[in-house]
Regions:
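Conserved pre-motif I regulatory segment
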Residues: 62-103
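Walker A/P-loop
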Residues: 96-119
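Conserved Walker A/P-loop ATP-binding site and its immediately adjacent core
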Residues: 111-116, 126-151, 366-368
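SF2 helicase catalytic motif II
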Residues: 189-192, 197-245
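Conserved helicase/translocase motor-coupling segment
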Residues: 289, 306-415
């Protein structure tokens, strides 16, 4: 039959010259899926009918078109196959009564893993109802994009949909008559706790078949969201590279109870070490850059530390809540050490023209930790804005194409696009690159913020470890603050405690770096010996986390 049709010997087939098809596709073809392709084909056939009116071609049965239309609306996995981690996470979630925390390293596909669980449930139930809560507007957009990639329909994002209140109200009313109507709701923690959203949750509280997904789930343990937990929803997924809430045992405990998942293994755990070994994240080199406090800064640090002593609880060994402002003041001394500017100038000036930085994130010290239960964006204080300007000037003076990446930028997508293409060499940011920014092309990171918060530096490291075809490995420089004029004769208890937090961060980075050995047997070891810090015990404790 093929030979006959090729020779134009069949009267019941229409032969459309390939050039006509090519021209049609190039000029007019807008089909986004199979159904539109078929409809486009029908339109093209009708054009041919006009020139071959003697030939009668039966239209496709409406039932078949309806079936195709239904098929095109169904969710599907957007990649050729699932990763082993996604299969194992779903299995563990099912075994834990559809509840759990997925403690997965940044960059290992937490979003896809959670949506895959929802897809699996749809395959069994033939409908889906999701509530996804995220900390920032940027993450809300990212989840919306991923949900569309899975072909989920009826996506309502409270960030992009101005009429979300009435849409959810109508859904709640209609669900009384049709409890299996598909919907994907994406909101931020700040909106989640609002009266309007809580009213919607109350109106659908009998709909136990929702799946509740909390991204960066540690935020759910904050004082606002923890009081609004949707306990009526049985299906729960918490996502976080670092689920534990620092200095908040009560919030952490309530979070673990809600998701029926506890450390260290959680429901499913996928570490950065596993991700690097399996080729999901790229390898990296790590360079600690030691920066001494000035004598004035060290004097101020000692003064604040002395003031803090009266707020130390002797029973728990922790500071009382009244110490918060002093703790912040002391942290800012470390964050904003003046010699960090000297160090980065020296570092940039030592680079040759061939090794000049590109695709580089610079994390500038920030003044405070944002509370995403109050706001879904990070607002920079005037003092902090002055600091990011000072560091920007350093790059400008060395003819780098740089851009400040701060909260509220309307052209943020265009900036990230310019960075990924190489038009922008350096992005300087406070917090805004921590959560919700996915730029695999980034291959360098400079940490100016001496954070002791594991969540922060783990997230930031993950930003530059994503795989990219043009990236062999990542490079990380970390400004490490040390006391001035260290000597063995010094009464160094304060200096020891100052540096101890820095050492823990160094070891966390170094333990997975390709140049691990050279880092440990370097100036780091000398300083630790002087201050009486057991470097190798800290290293051993760090490695136990990956067992």
């Amino acid at each position: 039959m093929f030979d006959n049709s090729w020779e134009h010997d069949t009267s019941h087939l229409i032969h459309i010259p390939i050039e006509r098809v090519k021209a049609y596709v190039l000029n007019d073809f807008k089909a986004a899926n199979t159904l539109e392709l078929i409809k486009a084909g029908i339109s093209l056939r009708e054009i041919e009918d006009a020139t071959n009116s003697s030939i009668e071609i039966k239209p496709l049965p409406q039932k078949l078109l309806d079936k195709l239309e239904q098929k095109e609306m169904e969710p599907r996995f957007p990649f050729p196959c699932e990763r082993e981690a996604q299969i194992l996470a779903y299995k563990a979630w099912k075994q834990n009564d559809n509840k759990g925390i997925f403690a997965m390293a940044t960059g290992t596909g937490k979003t896809v893993t959670a949506l895959n669980c929802a897809l699996k449930e749809w395959q069994q139930n033939n409908y889906y109802k999701l509530i996804i809560v995220v900390p920032t507007q940027a993450l809300a957009l990212q989840w919306e994009k991923e949900a569309k990639a899975f072909n989920f329909q009826n996506i309502v994002s409270t960030h992009t949909e101005k009429d979300w209140k009435s849409i959810l109200s109508r859904y709640a009313t209609n669900s009384i008559f049709n409890s299996k109507k598909n919907i994907v709701i994406i909101t931020t923690y700040a909106t989640f706790i609002l009266k309007h959203f809580q009213s919607f949750l109350y109106s659908v509280k009998n709909s136990e078949d929702f799946i509740f997904i909390a991204d960066e789930a540690h935020n759910l343990g904050a004082s606002g969201p923890i009081k609004k937990l949707p306990i009526f929803i049985n299906n729960r997924i918490g996502l976080s590279a670092t689920p534990e809430r620092i200095y908040d045992e009560i919030g952490s405990s309530q979070l673990y109870d809600f998701f029926n998942s506890k450390p260290p293994k959680y429901t499913y755990r996928f570490t950065m070490k596993e991700a690097i070994e399996q080729g999901i994240l790229c390898h990296y080199d790590y360079t600690p850059v030691f920066v001494e406090l000035t004598n004035i800064e060290m004097s101020e640090y000692r003064k604040v530390t002395d003031q803090l002593r009266k707020f130390l609880d002797p029973e728990t060994g922790k500071y009382k809540p009244e110490a918060e402002m002093l703790l912040m003041k002391r942290k800012r001394i470390i964050h904003k050490a003046e010699n960090k500017k000297v160090a980065i100038i020296r570092m940039l000036d030592d680079l040759t023209s061939e090794s000049k930085l590109k695709y580089t994130f610079v994390f500038v010290p920030e003044g405070y930790e944002p509370d995403y239960s109050v706001s879904d964006s990070y607002n920079i204080a005037k003092e902090d804005m002055h600091l990011i300007d000072e560091y920007s000037d350093i790059f400008r003076e060395r003819r780098y194409h740089y851009h400040k990446f701060i909260s509220g930028l309307e052209d943020a997508p265009e900036i990230l696009k310019g960075f990924a293409s190489g038009d922008i060499d350096v992005l300087l940011s406070m917090k805004c690159l921590d959560e919700g920014v996915d730029v695999p092309r980034a291959e360098n990171a400079i940490f100016l913020s001496s954070t002791g918060n594991p969540r922060q530096f783990i997230q930031r490291r993950g930003r530059v470890l994503r795989k990219h075809q043009d990236k062999e490995k990542a490079h990380i420089w970390d400004m490490v603050v040390v006391p001035p004029d260290i000597s063995e004769n010094l009464d160094n208890s304060i200096e020891k405690n100052l540096f101890l937090g820095e050492v823990k961060r160094i070891i966390n980075f170094a333990s997975l770096a390709d140049n691990r050995v050279s880092i440990i047997y370097s100036k780091l070891n000398d300083i630790c010996m002087t201050l009486g810090i057991d470097l190798f015990q800290i290293l051993e404790d760090e490695e136990k986390q990956y067992e």
